[in-house]
From Swiss-Prot:
Protein name, UniProt field: Peptidyl-prolyl cis-trans isomerase FKBP15-3
Keyword Isomerase: yes
Catalytic activity of the protein: [protein]-peptidylproline (omega=180) = [protein]-peptidylproline (omega=0)
Membrane-spanning ranges: none
Role of this protein: PPIases accelerate the folding of proteins. It catalyzes the cis-trans isomerization of proline imidic peptide bonds in oligopeptides.
Keywords from the named record: Isomerase, Rotamase
Alphabetized InterPro entries for the sequence: PPIase_dom_sf, PPIase_FKBP_dom
GO molecular function, one term: peptidyl-prolyl cis-trans isomerase activity
Record domain PPIase FKBP-type: where: 56-143
Species assigned in the record: Arabidopsis thaliana
């Protein structure tokens, strides 16, 4: 390899590293850790003029729930009926109630939920005790 070819290759590697670094910093900026350990990643903001999920409002969502450790899907509404519930009424795990708050219709979030905000020391069905959960959620409607 000639010196000019080597320089071009190094320049390309440097450009790729810069792009990767920028993508990483954007990803990190979209993560919001909650005081209770909940991590909210904003994947898509939703309609800025749309309705916002707030406590007491009825929300409709599609979600896929996975175990963080192995990625095993334990529940999903994708390809099925949307899931509807009143936000902050205790009808879902705390991580979903807190993680959806403030979300705009059309938005998508990835919620990484600690056991204390999920199913805790008891677990549930195929979810082992003390499991961290990952939910990919899309907010479809707010009433």
């Amino acid at each position: 390899m000639s010196p000019s070819e080597s320089a071009k290759k190094n320049e390309k590697i440097s450009e790729e590293a810069t792009v990767e670094s920028k993508a990483f910093s954007i990803s990190v900026e979209k993560q919001t850790p909650d005081l209770d350990g909940l991590i909210v990643e904003e994947l898509c903001m939703g309609n800025p003029n749309g309705k916002k999920a707030e406590p007491g409002k009825r929300v409709s969502v599609h979600y896929t729930g996975k175990l963080q450790g192995n990625g095993k899907i334990f529940d999903s509404t994708v390809g099925k009926s949307r899931y509807k519930f009143r936000l902050d009424a205790g009808k879902v795990i705390k991580g979903l109630d807190v993680g959806l708050n403030g979300m705009l219709v059309g938005g998508k979030r990835k919620l990484t939920i600690p056991p204390e905000m999920g199913y805790g020391a008891e677990g549930a069905g195929s979810i082992p005790p003390d499991s961290w959960l990952v939910f990919d959620v899309e907010l479809l409607n707010v009433k």
